[in-house]
């Protein structure tokens, strides 16, 4: 009976030694160096993901038709050019990066299709005066992965600046240029994508402005498209108002933790 405390002390000492050795091995690795097998984001355990906004918090951060003006209202359905132009242009594009972009515009899914990166909230609005349509999404994911998508988008004016497509007997010209977004959030990128029917006798050019902004581990993305030129005022208002609301939703979310 007198030996039990001593045995317990030895066991505790051995445990402390093992923990200390593990800590030293971890300290020996450079910061940011992964240990073990590197897995895809979808394979990582949920504990590795940052805390996401609740659905209610994400919905509260959405923009509304009232933010953009009297001509705007909740959408009544997908615009006709979504299938007639975007989908067929994507099907006729051989260049991988360009097709990926057109697919992302068609599905409104800029940040990937994994369940972990699924949008937390979405909104779709129509401009009844011009026929423009604005789709808006809020996504929660790892900041590094969000930045990876932003970096890819930023390369597209160079890698997919001008490409021809042909599908369903129609030849189209796709152009991707940089668009300067408002100075909001932690990181941001903007693009203007135009798709033109090369045989059209009248102006039938589809123009889609794309904005993506990261704020911490959350991001907002919007596409603003029309057969013509999207309103720069509406795009800017949606971006700035949305960023302010998302920032406030994040602040309130942290305060409730």
Which residues does each PLM region occupy?
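A short, solvent-exposed beta-edge/loop patch
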Residues: 175-240
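A small/polar (G/S/T-enriched), proline-flanked helix-loop surface module common
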Residues: 75-202
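N-terminal low-complexity, Pro/Thr-rich disordered segments
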Residues: 7, 14-61, 92-93, 248-257
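Sec/Tat-exported extracytoplasmic proteins
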Residues: 66-72, 76, 157-164, 242, ...
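Extracytoplasmic/secreted envelope proteins and their assembly/folding machinery
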Residues: 59-65, 69, 147-154, 236-239, ...
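N-terminal leader/capping segments at the start of a protein or of a new domain
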Residues: 47-91
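N-terminal export and membrane-targeting signals
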Residues: 1-10
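Second-shell loop/turn segments in exported
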Residues: 52-54, 134-141, 225-232
């Amino acid at each position: 009976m007198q030996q039990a405390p001593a045995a317990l002390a030895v066991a505790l000492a051995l445990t402390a030694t093992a923990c200390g050795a593990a800590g030293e091995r971890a300290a020996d690795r450079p910061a940011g160096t992964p240990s073990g097998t590197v897995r895809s984001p979808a394979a990582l355990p949920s504990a590795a993901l940052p805390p996401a906004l609740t659905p209610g918090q994400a919905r509260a951060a959405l923009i509304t038709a009232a933010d953009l003006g009297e001509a705007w209202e909740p959408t009544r359905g997908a615009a006709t050019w979504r299938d007639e132009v975007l989908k067929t242009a994507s099907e006729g594009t051989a260049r991988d990066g360009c097709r990926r972009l057109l697919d992302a515009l068609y599905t409104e899914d800029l940040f990937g299709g994994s369940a972990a990166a699924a949008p937390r909230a979405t909104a779709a609005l129509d401009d009844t005066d011009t026929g423009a349509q604005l789709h808006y999404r809020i996504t929660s994911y790892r900041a590094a992965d969000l930045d990876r998508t932003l970096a890819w988008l930023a390369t597209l004016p160079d890698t997919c600046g001008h490409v021809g497509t042909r599908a369903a007997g129609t030849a189209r010209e796709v152009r991707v240029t940089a668009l300067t977004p408002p100075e909001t959030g932690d990181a941001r990128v903007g693009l203007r994508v135009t798709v033109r029917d090369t045989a059209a006798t009248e102006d039938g050019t589809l123009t889609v402005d794309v904005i993506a902004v990261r704020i911490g581990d959350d991001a907002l993305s919007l596409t603003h498209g029309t057969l013509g030129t999207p309103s720069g005022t509406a795009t800017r208002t949606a971006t700035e108002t949305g960023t302010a609301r998302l920032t406030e939703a994040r602040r309130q979310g942290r305060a409730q933790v």
